[in-house]
């Protein structure tokens, strides 16, 4: 008899996120670990993406901002629910003012517990919408590829200036399976960010 949730696979929403980020050239993620993001943390590690664990979520976003600028790419930060997001907001606001391409990922309680006083249950998107280019809660595993693609594109400057984009996911969504039919190959192809600056094009 085994206790706890089943092992996470590469077809889980968390696995698809990690695979897409790796395919898009993300080689490290800055964050502070927490229960709501453990599925994603585990799959990022499984994909060989370096996890830089910090002591404060502001630092995670600052570091993602700086790393992205140095690489002329999108920096990625991963923070947990509630105080993880509120702590990160200073870094998100700084990236917004600087028009820096940063993707911030977080988690929320499982869908059956939303708006019922669960641990660290907050509507994060309402908090960050004014300082991001894109802010969504992705509740269905099947929507993960297109929402992550859209967030990366908006952060890179699609339709306007670059800037931070924000996505969060219920923990049960992160553990849910993305149907193979929806894992189209183009989601996992490298894509040059539109306004980040292509390293080969910069003298």
Stretches found by the model and what they are:
Residues 2-203:
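N-terminal alpha/beta PP-like core and its mobile active-site loop of ThDP/TPP-dependent enzymes
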């Amino acid at each position: 008899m085994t206790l706890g949730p089943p092992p996470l696979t590469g077809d889980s929403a968390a696995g698809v996120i990690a695979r897409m980020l790796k395919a898009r050239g993300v080689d490290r993620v800055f964050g502070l670990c927490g229960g709501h993001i453990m599925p994603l943390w585990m799959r990022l590690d499984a994909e060989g993406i370096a996890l830089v664990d910090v002591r404060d979520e502001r630092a995670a976003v600052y570091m993602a901002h700086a790393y992205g600028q140095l690489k002329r790419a999108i920096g990625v930060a991963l923070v947990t629910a509630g105080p993880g997001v509120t702590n990160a907001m200073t870094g998100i606001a700084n990236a917004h003012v600087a028009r820096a391409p940063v993707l911030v990922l977080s988690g929320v309680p499982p869908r059956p517990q939303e708006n019922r006083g669960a641990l660290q249950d907050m509507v994060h998107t309402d908090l960050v919408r004014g300082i991001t280019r894109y802010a969504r809660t992705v509740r269905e595993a099947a929507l993960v590829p297109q929402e992550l693609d859209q967030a990366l594109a908006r952060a890179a400057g699609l339709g306007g200036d670059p800037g931070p984009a924000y996505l969060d996911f219920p923990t049960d969504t992160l553990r849910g399976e993305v149907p193979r039919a929806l894992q189209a190959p183009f989601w996992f192809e490298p894509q040059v960010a539109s306004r980040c600056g292509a390293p080969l094009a910069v003298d």
